[in-house]
From Swiss-Prot:
One of its GO terms (biological process) is peptidoglycan biosynthetic process. Its main location: membrane. It comes from Fervidobacterium nodosum (strain ATCC 35602 / DSM 5306 / Rt17-B1). Its EC number is 3.6.1.27. The lineage of its organism: Bacteria, Thermotogati, Thermotogota, Thermotogae, Thermotogales. This is Undecaprenyl-diphosphatase. Belongs to the UppP family. Bacitracin is thought to be involved in the inhibition of peptidoglycan synthesis by sequestering undecaprenyl diphosphate, thereby reducing the pool of lipid carrier available.
């Protein structure tokens, strides 16, 4: 039952710009469930499939374009790879430091506030760049925002959306790029930890919960991104931030 509950939390908070890692660390402590990074990473595979379904047409266009040697699609695929590199480097070389951050609930509270402040400002920015218009430097900048989000309490979706909006992307394409960018890192994280997860009925129920709630969250975040209402999530984030400061 606890695994299913945590799967629901993972699916919702993975895509809503409120930090899934921070919420999982917080709720694990509240329900006295050991912080299991392998299990949380396994749930990433479920959220991978949620993105795959919602953005299937875009993913198909990229894959079909690669087969047909479409220059725009090859460039876009390369930009996604470039954006994925910074977070990959942080994950490989600073894993122990990131894991240590999960043990400090007050530090997680600070990171919640950082995400809240960034989201409050994000609705002021957007531009006219489409997926095909962004440069390799733009892709690297968004990737740096994603790398920061390996810290618990910093939202990956929130920070990549902010990065995409700051480089001047349209809100629709900022949403698409943010979640296309999530595919390599979420799948890799899930597969790397799969060997450390016991595939019991409980863990599979958590997987199902993450998938279903992930789809719901994706639809919601697409709406709030396009309508420039991300700031409302910054108000919500004050709650887990305050709770984190009072947790022992």
């Amino acid at each position: 039952m606890k695994e299913f509950f945590l799967g629901i939390i993972q699916g919702l908070t993975e895509f809503l710009p409120v930090s899934s890692s921070g919420h999982l660390a917080l709720f694990s402590k509240i329900i006295s469930f050991p912080s299991d990074l392998a299990l949380f990473a396994f749930f990433h595979i479920a959220t991978f499939f949620a993105v795959f379904i919602l953005l299937f047409n875009d993913i198909w266009n990229i894959l079909y374009g690669l087969v047909r040697s479409d220059k725009n699609m090859w460039n876009l695929a390369l930009k996604i790879i470039i954006s994925s590199i910074p977070a990959g480097i942080v994950g490989l070389f600073f894993e122990s430091k990131v894991e240590a951050a999960f043990s400090s609930q007050k530090l997680i509270g600070v990171f919640f506030l950082v995400t809240a402040a960034a989201l409050w400002l994000s609705d002021k920015y957007s531009g006219n760049k489409t997926l095909n218009d962004i440069t390799y430097l733009d892709a690297l900048i968004v990737g740096l925002f994603q790398a920061i989000a390996v810290l618990p309490g910093i939202s990956r979706s929130g920070f990549t959306l902010i990065g995409a909006l700051l480089i001047g992307m349209t809100r629709v394409d900022a949403f698409k790029y943010s979640f296309l960018l999530s595919l390599p890192i979420t799948l890799a994280a899930g597969l790397l930890e799969l060997k450390n997860v016991d595939l019991t009925t409980a863990t599979l129920s958590g997987f199902a919960g993450a998938f279903i709630s992930g789809l719901v969250a994706l639809i919601l975040v697409r709406f709030v991104t396009i309508s420039a209402h991300l700031k409302y999530f910054s108000i919500y984030l004050l709650i887990p931030a305050i709770v984190s400061f009072f947790m022992k």
